Amino acid sequence: MEEMGYWMGDLLEELGCEKNQEVCQELLKKCGGRCAERNALPGMGGLKEELSGVDSMEEMARIISRHTGAECVPEKDGFLLTYNREKGCDCSIVKAGYVHSPVFCSCTQGFHQKVWSTILERPVTVELVETFLRGGSCCSQKIIFTIS
């Protein structure tokens, strides 16, 4: 499997160069969305059901924290989701040492976009605030959407 690590590193290094930055980010976001479909969303039906009909950002944050274990801070236009403080990246590909490039965090962005747009049944925008691969001590994203 060491070869896989080198291969992934080479691929991300090439995709991460200036001329391919947008293409790489979009590709990684799509991969993250597919990962969410396979690995996260099947177990999140209870969260989706409990959030259904909730229109208070504060109540949404409490429910999300209870279900995910993440810090969830309500904001005017969404919430700030922070998890794994000082514990390291959740991604099994990163944990296995296959990737070290911060460009890989676009995968996380796509993952959360798929999760929260599906759970909340509305379009969301995900902004990466802090990540381990970018030198942070946690993984934090701002999930932006409008409450109908």
Task: Label every PLM stretch briefly.
Residues 1-103, 124-126, 136, 146-148:
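N-terminal accessory segment detector
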Residues 102-121:
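Active-site helix/loop of acyl-thioester processing domains in fatty-acid/polyketide metabolism
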Residues 130-142:
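Beta-rich nucleic-acid/ligand-interaction surfaces
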